[in-house]
């Protein structure tokens, strides 16, 4: 197995409560992994740590050098006055200008059921917003795709 992520003895504590302790996991190239558990067990926290958006309190996280990681958070942030297309492009990050990127974003949004990319986000449902965020994450290639509750709406 060609390991792209190695987690050893990972710890996270919130206000004197250990969320997880001595957690270990190895993710190989091409593997799929699902975290399943009850609320409050640290699944989202572990994913934020993997994505580099939060730091562990102990242990070791080794990510293969140059690994392209794309992360869809559980609660993506929206600017209510922006359009679905603008939100998708903003969430895509990186180089998002140009006709090719805009066309690809529109195609991806349509494939995910967002058929009116010029509507303001404030008029959209939670599920539509989640699909817009997913399109933004999928717009650029990634070696590791981290999706935190991508279908919870």
Where is each model-derived feature located?
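Short hydrophobic beta-strand immediately N-terminal to the Walker A/P-loop
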Residues: 33-35, 47
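Catalytic Walker B motif of ABC-type/P-loop ATPase nucleotide-binding domains
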Residues: 145-149
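Conserved beta1/A-loop at the N-terminus of ABC ATPase nucleotide-binding domains
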Residues: 5-15, 61
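Conserved structural motif at the start of ABC-family nucleotide-binding domains
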Residues: 5, 20-22
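Conserved hydrophobic segment flanking the Walker A/P-loop of ABC-type ATPase nucleotide-binding domains
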Residues: 27-29, 63
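The feature captures the beta-strand-to-loop junction immediately N-terminal to the Walker
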Residues: 23, 36-38
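ABC-family P-loop ATPase nucleotide-binding domains
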Residues: 2-3, 9, 67, 73-136, ...
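Helix-to-loop junction immediately C-terminal to a conserved catalytic motif
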Residues: 51
């Amino acid at each position: 197995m060609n390991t792209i992520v190695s987690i050893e003895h990972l710890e996270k504590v919130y206000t004197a409560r250990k969320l997880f302790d001595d957690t270990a996991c190895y993710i190989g190239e091409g593997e799929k992994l699902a975290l399943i558990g009850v609320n409050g067990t640290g699944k989202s926290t572990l994913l934020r740590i993997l994505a580099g958006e939060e730091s562990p309190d102990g242990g070791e996280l080794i990510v293969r050098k140059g690994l392209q990681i794309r992360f869809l958070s559980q609660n993506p942030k929206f600017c209510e006055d922006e359009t679905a297309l603008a939100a998708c492009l903003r969430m895509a990050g990186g180089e998002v200008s140009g006709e090719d990127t805009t066309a690809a974003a529109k195609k991806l949004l349509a494939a995910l059921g967002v058929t009116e990319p010029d509507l303001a986000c404030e008029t959209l449902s939670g599920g539509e917003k989640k699909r817009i965020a997913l399109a933004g994450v999928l717009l650029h290639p990634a070696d590791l795709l981290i999706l935190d509750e991508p279908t919870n709406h």
